[in-house]
């Protein structure tokens, strides 16, 4: 998974003339997002909600900043 993700990160950075380092995910970020995706898929009954809710959290973080853990918790109502 990580090799594919690294290539996707490099491709994304190149498409917006940025550094791949700008899109680096820590292991904690990966764990948070995978847990959010799991919750979204299981609680909603629709697997398609998993990537969409992760995208929404990414939009919120990009537009307003904030701690990823706090945004994930708010998203799932904790």
What are the language-model segments listed below?
Residues 1-78:
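Feature captures hydrophobic
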């Amino acid at each position: 998974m990580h090799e594919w993700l690294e290539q996707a990160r490099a491709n994304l950075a190149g498409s917006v003339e940025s550094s791949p380092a700008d899109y680096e995910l820590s292991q904690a970020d990966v764990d948070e997002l995978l847990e959010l995706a799991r919750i979204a898929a299981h609680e909603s009954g629709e697997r398609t909600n998993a990537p969409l809710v992760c995208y929404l959290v990414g939009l919120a973080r990009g537009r307003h900043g904030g701690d990823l853990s706090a945004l994930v918790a708010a998203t799932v109502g904790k």
